[in-house]
Amino acid sequence: METTSEKQGRILLVDDESAILRTFRYCLEDEGYSVATASSAPQAEALLQRQVFDLCFLDLRLGEDNGLDVLAQMRVQAPWMRVVIVTAHSAVDTAVDAMQAGAVDYLVKPCSPDQLRLAAAKQLEVRQLTARLEALEDEVRRQGDGLESHSPAMAAVLETARQVAATDANILILGESGSGKGELARAIHTWSKRAKKPQVTINCPSLTAELMESELFGHSRGAFTGATESTLGRVSQADGGTLFLDEIGDFPLTLQPKLLRFIQDKEYERVGDPVTRRADVRILAATNRDLGAMVAQGQFREDLLYRLNVIVLNLPPLRERAEDILGLAERFLARFVKDYGRPARGFSEAAREAMRQYPWPGNVRELRNVIERASIICNQELVDVDHLGFSAAQSASSAPRIGESLSLEDLEKAHITAVMASSATLDQAAKTLGIDASTLYRKRKQYGL
């Protein structure tokens, strides 16, 4: 059962003064919040690797550590977390700089318990509302994106997906980044007999091995430093429904035996708790990586792969669904001009030709982002090539040659490189790619970018 603190949110306090940490912690725990403390930047970083926090109170003066640098690292590690700066009167200007860098508010020392409680309640309410709004917007915006198709290859995949959705068979969805794996997983859940139960998603690249085990199976109070309350895992949250493991190729190798056991026996233990629990969960997984090659290289367990790929669905990349490109573009344009109140109503012939020729390494996600940008900057009735950000000639020259074989990793690396080159900041690049900042950080590290 979810505790009060789990419902209200998890808070991280970062301050090098133990008396302030103690006072803040007692005040917030009295309100029922789950609170963890860190007295230095390395301690805070270690906690963020193990736990998910909704809110952080960060002191700008952390001994030798620069609070703005700590804030920047937090934005990479936990971009969803709201950060409130705590500062002295003499550093208010720096607090304003911190807000421009991503903090959401600041408190001036000494602050009263009422000020602290009010700030926590306000920011956690915003966090909860934002999460709900993002979930609703994501569901509405992505419902069926890229799944409606005139392509025979895509139609065959959808027909198979509808047939197997009615069963409880595990399904592995293969496809390049942005090809619609998440949308297909959502559709399969909707078509299944589990549709009235939750579909819970874990984005595997965004979690470290330590955090993954806690997020997947939950943990008990005192299981590790900072674990002040017991938490439910995603497995428990998905009981009766569907667990979607997005980018399963990035699932930590050290945890794969525990995942295998859960898939086989439906049994698991929370971190720090010997009690064996059960959950009735259907597993969907997706990846843009070659799991067979990873098995051969010792990077993925063969027995786990056999459990995951009972049914395999291969999503074709957008460049192999040429008949769908313009239809998707028109649908996206109609949506975005309505959202933003822009004048565009269609595409020039040059723009249509450029979209036909472009290889779309980022697939449907890239097409959606390109059209969103074009709808915003276009001040006329027809979107032209300049609004798309590429020309027909450039599109043709960048398209894969017939017979050329590129791995999914090569395509993803090329796509990420191109997007970063055309983006002013890494945050902008992550948004264009449709991933969060921490996932982009891991991808850059993976590909040496």
From Swiss-Prot:
Protein name (database record): Alginate biosynthesis transcriptional regulatory protein AlgB
One GO MF term, please? ATP hydrolysis activity
Q: Does the keyword Transcription regulation apply?
A: yes
Q: Which domain of life is it from?
A: Bacteria
Q: Where does this protein act, in terms of pathway?
A: Glycan biosynthesis; alginate biosynthesis [regulation]
Q: Which GO terms describe its biological process?
A: alginic acid biosynthetic process; negative regulation of single-species biofilm formation on inanimate substrate; phosphorelay signal transduction system; positive regulation of cell motility; positive regulation of DNA-templated transcription; positive regulation of proteolysis; positive regulation of secondary metabolite biosynthetic process
A Pfam family that the UniProt record links to this protein:
Sigma54_activat
Give me the gene this protein comes from: algB
Q: What are the entry keywords? A: Activator, Alginate biosynthesis, ATP-binding, DNA-binding, Nucleotide-binding, Phosphoprotein, Transcription, Transcription regulation, Two-component regulatory system
Ranges for the Response regulatory domain?
A: 10-124
